[in-house]
């Protein structure tokens, strides 16, 4: 159901030391705009959370895609520009200050949530952003003249931090949306043009459905974003078209597409790893995608020629192999790991000696206990020594009354029986 939030609680106390009920805490709040789980996300669609703040006739907008680490801001003095941006973005959640008058003007948008006014405080927001990015000021992000947008960004950052209950290391930069570089399409025109959604809200018979020949989820989402935000600059448009034409005419075009079809959704996998919510198969997909990079890089180098478009040369330069990480994952992760880590069988044998020993104990506990009993008998010289188990004490070592006095000082007496 849209708009529902779910709190996840986990046991954080130790039952062995807790007096009374074991301590439990909320470790995550899942909301529509802060999803990162693969099963809850549409691979072809962005999942966005936005915040809007109004002050002195200026409107500040902040946009975050938690599942990829994208973080953007916009400031405008025109309400229609703000509405056009929100219509383009289609956020799953829209954060507004409590009792804000602007709520009446934005009631057409879904997912509105009211947040405390202090979360939009400019000074607090500035500090939160500087702490997040590890900088002394925000001038490097070209946002110094966007104070109202910074207020909105501070609210989004606080909200996402509150719901995820952890640091957000994959948020590494703040980007300024420059709508003067793109064509602004009003909500009505956008709906009637059926760029990415048809009039019924589906994707069939849209411009995107006709043009989308992408091979990766990341490419599909990027294409949709480009279609909803058309460029104004003819030079940049020609640069994109020239890059596409060069690739299409190159002999490596089809092999390149075949390789990309094998790639995982790296953008979202990396975000889940940063948020410590990745599952074993995320690591397997990352491993398999990294394994493609050497060949992918080799193919791209054949495209780098003096007359190639600069955009293509930049892309080729960024397609680099990561041998250290690829080798680490290849040695560590099983070929086909389970869906969830609690099922075991994630780490390959031979990767970690201590883990191998623990797995051996887990898989053959009876043999381990016999071995332990034999070793302890030999070490202590106590022939009556036995290893046993009960529900009260768990595993224990039992000695006869005669030999109990000879027990090593490292043994701790738990109970005295009739003859032991």
Kindly label every feature range from the protein language model.
Residues 410-420:
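Divalent-cation-assisted or electrostatically stabilized phosphate/pyrophosphate-binding catalytic cores
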Residues 98, 389, 401:
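Active-site proximal loops enriched in glycine and acidic residues that flank catalytic Cys/His/Asp
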Residues 1-249, 254, 261-274, 278-374:
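Charged catalytic and DNA/RNA-contacting regions of genome-maintenance
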Residues 401-410:
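Cytochrome P450 core scaffold surrounding the K-helix E-X-X-R motif
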Residues 367-387:
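Flexible, glycine/threonine-enriched loop-and-boundary segments that flank and lead into catalytic domains
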